[in-house]
Amino acid sequence: MRKKLTALVLSALPLAAVADVSLYGEIKAGVEGRNYQLQLTEAQAANGGASGQVKVTKVTKAKSRIRTKISDFGSFIGFKGSEDLGDGLKAVWQLEQDVSVAGGGATQWGNRESFIGLAGEFGTLRAGRVANQFDDASQAIDPWDSNNDVASQLGIFKRHDDMPVSVRYDSPEFSGFSGSVQFVPIQNSKSAYTPAYYTKDTNNNLTLVPAVVGKPGSDVYYAGLNYKNGGFAGNYAFKYARHANVGRNAFELFLIGSGSDQAKGTDPLKNHQVHRLTGGYEEGGLNLALAAQLDLSENGDKTKNSTTEIAATASYRFGNAVPRISYAHGFDFIERGKKGENTSYDQIIAGVDYDFSKRTSAIVSGAWLKRNTGIGNYTQINAASVGLRHKF
């Protein structure tokens, strides 16, 4: 009897040691369909008889077939915990991992927000892969679940959301206000990258120029200020990098769905800074969120680039159903000091979540995104999805 009791106590010790560890995550997947439309307008020269050359406009339109597939909508699993170190000090840690019920996907542990740190009356200090201040505020403005982060989520607006390998400090709350600062060392910032391309000689022979991976850009700095009072919440997020690897080319690549760090680093810039202001209001079943974003940078020749965008999301709960709509608009961008004519974008996402329980919901959405790429030119994406989400 004594041996059995001893064995029982010993077997319970590991469980007691990890009693403060929480397992959590989301499993979500469904069916998605999308198609692309584009229009290209070209000015061509044609013979005009005695009058000489006459300019002729050629308009080309194209449309893809509807592509439908079963996709994972961003499933993940996480572990987090803490340990009381005494005198109000705690050790905190978290490990998150992307998973996919559709097969494939990321295989490295800790590819989502994962860190270790200390928390106390002074605030919280964390090191690891930590979400930045832009990512903090995005849930309010973009609560959509989808595999298509460009059209079925506000992917262009959220292109600065990141979980960089960094150190971050969050202050305690004072009268509704709190702040944070974050630092990404140069060796942890994304590398500069020039994609492969073809050149043509005088005989029209094509030569492939291979891709070139350069050195890291520079240290990256983030800061944030939050305010919460009753149903109102506000957030300001800031980013600065002296040498950045995100520019207009990255903007284009993100539009067509490229998600790699290398693809995001095609246009090295200087003095890159981003400002985003987000405000939200929640009362009963009503949720409203508004956001504005300004992206500024310089080129090697001292000319300047900028993009200005706005986004809004509204939802209201009717029993188990939560209909929702989002809208985003990007104004004509400025490149090398000159305004790009007809370079804006517009995006609308509408859908509904239906809660079967507190943890399981059906999710339905439809999306439309139109990106103007010059006078008479545009790319349009139409998408729809139906899926199921379970939280644990």
Swiss-Prot record:
Keywords: Cell outer membrane, Ion transport, Membrane, Porin, Signal, Transmembrane, Transmembrane beta strand, Transport. This is Major outer membrane protein P.IA. It is a multi-pass membrane protein. Gene3D superfamilies: Porin. The keyword Magnesium does not apply. It comes from the Bacteria. It comes from Neisseria meningitidis serogroup B / serotype 15 (strain H44/76). Belongs to the Gram-negative porin family. GO terms for biological process: monoatomic ion transmembrane transport. It is found in: Cell outer membrane. GO terms for molecular function: porin activity. Serves as a slightly cation selective porin. Major antigen on the gonococcal cell surface and it may have pathogenic properties in addition to its porin activity. InterPro entries: Gram-neg_bact_OMP (IPR050298), Gram_neg_porin_domain (IPR033900), Porin_dom_sf (IPR023614), Porin_Gram-ve (IPR001702), Porin_Gram-ve_CS (IPR013793), Porin_Neis (IPR002299).
